[in-house]
Amino acid sequence: MFDVTANGASIPALGFGTFRIPGPDVLRIVPHALKAGFRHIDTAQIYGNEAEVGEAIAASGIARGDIFLTTKVWVENYKHDAFLASVDESLKKLKTDYVDLLLLHWPNEAVSLAEQIGALNAVKEAGKVRHIGVSNFNTALMAEAVKLSKAPIVTNQIEYHPYIDQDVVM
């Protein structure tokens, strides 16, 4: 498998997503994904399986530095203090002291984008994440996020397939 590079991040092009995979199934399936050669594992706070993802990675025998781990902060945690606490909780569940990529899961107008991006930058500066990004942002929000961020926004993770044309965002 090959990597793509974006703003200093080298990201495995093909990742194994854990959306809608219950915890017990994660414990069974993620080891097979790792054995098959996947080195990018994607999870999120809202998926409810971060602990099992962390357990599967820890038990894999693969060095943590050889796995690219992505998680996402859920919208209810976007206020600065809640954001910081939720990242610490995610790291504990994932059994690691950093994630390779941390994303804002969805846009949330209830919290200013400046506060959201500020929190992303704070956890990056603290060494808890290597790279930051967003998910499901439209082009205007993405442009604003880039302007607000001290650190590079390395990705806007979106759903893209023949039934969802997102060429405008791409």
Pin down the residues of each PLM region.
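Conserved, mostly hydrophobic/aromatic
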Residues: 16, 33, 41, 53, ...
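A short, structured active-site edge motif that brings together acidic residues
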Residues: 64-77, 98-107, 136, 159-160
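N-terminal binding-site loop/beta-alpha segment at the start of enzyme catalytic domains
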Residues: 1-67
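Active-site mouth loops of central-metabolism enzymes
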Residues: 12-24, 71-81, 110
